[in-house]
């Protein structure tokens, strides 16, 4: 398979720079102004088949179940996010999109699939638009962790699969949860990383642990998955488990990034047999068979502590406790009303690890009289990003639920992808 890499001449870049600069400035303002409205909708409705948009939720229609293809019509200009997949669009006008999903194994040449310098960074989408010029940006989700500074964003490429083969394009910019494709062409597309030759391959990724139990009066069965943080992949696993009456337990993902390709050991406090005990953190496209560990817990009369340890360095990377009360054999109760304050409390460690620049958040909290000038300076004086985050979270938690609600609202406006990501993990 040929790999022609798309390129733009210096003259083209120069001639287009002025116009595109003005457009991008306007588009960035659209994202900023609509983010508040969009993320407020996260509190109200979080259905899988809905985009969050500037004027509320927009339904997604399944038009071909056999190919898992969807259609959506955006009624106005603005920024739209599909939390179930992490896919986002910035549009200039009314537009109709058709969205399908592909498998890397079916389209990526075999010699590249097993080449140590290439790494799949996210799902593969088949996107068409009518009219195409109405779409200003596509935000393609990825699960590569940028927070440790170990990944060079120049490694990110958008792979387009066309009749002539795979065409590679550099994204306009790379953000913590997505890469931006400006003035997009439409095709089967996804994110690939081309690692510099000679680079030691140890790529940190955000990951997720999924635990499902299968009720039985004599012997409750558990399945535990360790997978990249791909919302679409999680949904596909949910659907597959649901076919066999599996019920997902709410758990937090690992706080720190895990290394792609590393091996991890699953253990438990009850000395129950786990098969297999070892899981490799790898990416398999949605629709492919996903690896998991399985164990049986009898009638589950005592709590079970589960742990995942990195095999090479014997480092504990994740643990949780499953209690008998968590296993609901009866009908599921109605979910409680969403609370921004509860969200911040429950995700303290995740927010501490993942929140970025706090300048805008601190300004919001000072404007709303949650923080004084002295308290704001105290946060800013902390030496590291995580210590700044922890200082802020601890300080606001002491001020009560109203302060936490205002903090949640500010984080939603400033970093909607982070809030969407954390909400998706808890579904």
From Swiss-Prot:
Region described as UPA: spans on this chain: 187-336
Key words, A-Z: Apoptosis, Cytoplasm, Hydrolase, Immunity, Inflammasome, Inflammatory response, Innate immunity, Necrosis, Nucleus, Protease, Ubl conjugation
InterPro entries assigned: CARD (IPR001315), DEATH-like_dom_sf (IPR011029), FIIND_dom (IPR025307), NLRP_Inflammasome (IPR051249)
SUPFAM superfamilies registered for this protein in UniProt: DEATH domain
Domain CARD: 336-426
Record-annotated FIIND domain positions: 51-336
UniProt-listed Enzyme Commission number(s): 3.4.-.-
Regulation: CARD8 inflammasome is inhibited by DPP8 and DPP9, which sequester the C-terminal fragment of CARD8 (Caspase recruitment domain-containing protein 8, C-terminus) in a ternary complex, thereby preventing CARD8 oligomerization and activation. CARD8 inflammasome is activated by Val-boroPro (Talabostat, PT-100), an inhibitor of dipeptidyl peptidases DPP8 and DPP9. Val-boroPro relieves inhibition of DPP8 and/or DPP9 by inducing the proteasome-mediated destruction of the N-terminal part of CARD8, releasing its C-terminal part from autoinhibition.
Region of interest (Disordered), ranges: 1-23
Cellular component aspect of the GO annotation: NLRP3 inflammasome complex; nucleus
Gene Ontology annotations of biological process type: inflammatory response; innate immune response; proteolysis; regulation of apoptotic process; regulation of canonical NF-kappaB signal transduction
Main localization category: cytoplasm
UniProt region (ZU5), positions on chain: 51-186
Location relative to the cell: Cytoplasm; Nucleus
Any GO molecular function: cysteine-type endopeptidase activator activity involved in apoptotic process
Residue numbers marked as site, Cleavage: 186-187
PANTHER family the UniProt entry points to: CASPASE RECRUITMENT DOMAIN-CONTAINING PROTEIN 8, NACHT, LRR AND PYD DOMAINS-CONTAINING PROTEIN 1
Function (record text): Inflammasome sensor, which mediates inflammasome activation in response to various pathogen-associated signals, leading to subsequent pyroptosis of CD4(+) T-cells and macrophages. Inflammasomes are supramolecular complexes that assemble in the cytosol in response to pathogens and other damage-associated signals and play critical roles in innate immunity and inflammation. Acts as a recognition receptor (PRR): recognizes specific pathogens and other damage-associated signals, such as Val-boroPro inhibitor, and mediates CARD8 inflammasome activation.
Domain-related comment: The disordered region is required for activation of the CARD8 inflammasome.
Subunit structure: Interacts with DPP9; leading to inhibit activation of the inflammasome. DPP9 acts via formation of a ternary complex, composed of a DPP9 homodimer, one full-length CARD8 protein, and one cleaved C-terminus of CARD8 (Caspase recruitment domain-containing protein 8, C-terminus). Interacts with DPP8; leading to inhibit activation of the inflammasome, probably via formation of a ternary complex with DPP8. Interacts with NLRP3. Interacts with IKBKG/NEMO. Interacts with DRAL. Binds to caspase-1 (CASP1), CARD16/pseudo-ICE and CARD18/ICEBERG. Interacts with NLRP2 (via NACHT domain).
Name of the protein described by the UniProt record: Caspase recruitment domain-containing protein 8
